[in-house]
Amino acid sequence: MTKRNVLIFHSGAMGDFVVSWPLAMACCRVMPQNRVIYVTAGQKGKLAEHVLGVESIDIESGFASLWQGADGAPENVRKLVAGAAMIFSFGTHDDDQWSAAVRAIAPEARLIHLTTKCPDAFAGHVARYMVEQIKAVQPAVAAAVGQMVSALFRRG
């Protein structure tokens, strides 16, 4: 089965959610053959669908089960995650139960953990920090995100 989903898991606040929008748009540009899907709160997902033209699925539709392990995940969750080529996750860590469950369901998928909490030593905007995090693991996506963020800063 060809993996065509790019999943963006986000359960944070609205401001952090909006900061993630250049990531979604960059994925659409860099991987136009893939489906970019936000897994987030229902209304935030609908907003992203309307403004960005991406897909969304409500995080409350069984995705919390990933915190209990892969075996307990409902079929809809397993199917979506198994079809992922790349998974961006805000608020999870490489060594937590959620990540282990995702890796068990989709071992070939590229799992990338992101945070909107900049280290004290980082003096830039959180959007630029997101670019720095992505650069090490997905340079093409990072370059596209960086171009969009730079354009936003130039235009205001």
Report each predicted region and the residues it spans.
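Catalytic machinery of carbohydrate-active enzymes
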Residues: 1-156
